[in-house]
């Protein structure tokens, strides 16, 4: 399984959530609404989730092993850094996405 596209939508509001991401796998399957969060130990990703009637959050889609989670997180955070730097240098403030 290869990550074939990462699309970053930066969040301009102040807060811990920095971006919302869509990731495409093998040009065939996409997962939307992955969040880039600023935590105490740096950036990390949160998979898309929904709130249950009991108030608990359950992932809608998620990797089933650590290796895959790390692969997805690295691809997202690497692309986030590129987009963050490009946006800083973009005078028009346009949204920037990247396709691999």
Curated annotation (Swiss-Prot):
One of its GO terms (biological process) is sporulation resulting in formation of a cellular spore. Signal peptide: none annotated. The keyword Cell division applies. InterPro entries: SpoVG, SpoVG_sf. Keywords: Cell cycle, Cell division, Septation. The keyword Cell division applies. Could be involved in septation. Belongs to the SpoVG family. This is Putative septation protein SpoVG. The gene is spoVG.
């Amino acid at each position: 399984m290869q990550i074939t596209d990462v699309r970053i939508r930066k969040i301009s509001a102040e807060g811990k959530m920095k971006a919302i991401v869509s990731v495409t796998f093998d040009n065939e399957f996409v997962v939307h609404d992955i969040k880039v969060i600023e935590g105490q130990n740096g950036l990390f990703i949160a998979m898309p989730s929904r709130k249950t009637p009991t108030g608990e959050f359950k992932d809608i889609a998620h990797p089933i092993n650590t290796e895959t989670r790390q692969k997805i997180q690295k691809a997202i955070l690497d692309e986030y850094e590129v987009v963050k730097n490009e946006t800083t240098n973009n005078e028009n403030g346009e949204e920037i996405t990247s396709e691999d």
